[in-house]
């Protein structure tokens, strides 16, 4: 058993670590609130873009937009979002396991795949794997928002160009979904082709509108060109929304990880104090025994 001085030193060391984890918990909680605000702010833009695409598509019902329709899947693309920093529990590794499960299914079905990674954790993880073709990388830095947006936009454009050129037939976005402060779960959503734009009822209504005539926008350019640009903006907004939601998940996971670390530090301190008291008790008992032995000898 360690002596009393060593135990006191350990207690002080754990207390210092506890102060750090407690401070990191508070910082993560503050950043999480800001990230949730940003996440919620981007949603109205995505919903508005969705509505406009519906209206424009209804006006050009016969135009076979490549971003809207399914085709035979021979190769797929993944945009994988992760964090740049650690200390956020199993947030990243759970997401990577989810993506690898999908990739394994593709390999079994003889479907090829390309990967675009956002965040250093995803870049480091997938770079170590064999047979994973990383075609683009980007990082999101909250201190350099404009530079990050340009870098992410460039990475997304690489995947969009591959889809337009027919090099990939489906594009997925892998990120974490913010369920609550204590719960985040991996999510894989289809970016291209744009799915669930119309329900069956909406498709029927749009066909009736197209035959009867209805209101429409005034286009400065060709309607097909406008629709293509809208689809690209919509995809970019979806990616940005997923990145901001993943950032909120990161801060929530880090806050909980630091809270657990702080609580564990309290448990360790209690155990060390108990060990210290046992050592002190043994020392006192030994001293009393020596005094009694000395008195008996006299």
From Swiss-Prot:
Self-association and partners: F-type ATPases have 2 components, CF(1) - the catalytic core - and CF(0) - the membrane proton channel. CF(1) has five subunits: alpha(3), beta(3), gamma(1), delta(1), epsilon(1). CF(0) has three main subunits: a, b and c.
PROSITE patterns (alphabetical): ATPASE_GAMMA
CDD domains, A to Z: F1-ATPase_gamma
Keywords assigned: ATP synthesis, Cell inner membrane, Cell membrane, CF(1), Hydrogen ion transport, Ion transport, Membrane, Transport
SUPFAM superfamilies per UniProt: ATP synthase (F1-ATPase), gamma subunit
Subcellular location: Cell inner membrane
Short name of any one Pfam family annotated for the protein: ATP-synt
Transport recorded as keyword: yes
Lipid bilayer topology: Peripheral membrane protein
Source taxonomy: Bacteria, Pseudomonadati, Pseudomonadota, Gammaproteobacteria, Thiotrichales
GO biological process: proton motive force-driven plasma membrane ATP synthesis
GO molecular function: ATP binding; proton-transporting ATP synthase activity, rotational mechanism
Major subcellular site: membrane
HAMAP family registered for this protein in UniProt: ATP_synth_gamma_bact
Any one annotated GO CC term: proton-transporting ATP synthase complex
Signal peptide: none
Annotated family: Belongs to the ATPase gamma chain family.
Function recorded in the entry: Produces ATP from ADP in the presence of a proton gradient across the membrane. The gamma chain is believed to be important in regulating ATPase activity and the flow of protons through the CF(0) complex.
Protein name, entry field: ATP synthase gamma chain
Species annotation: Francisella tularensis subsp. holarctica (strain LVS)
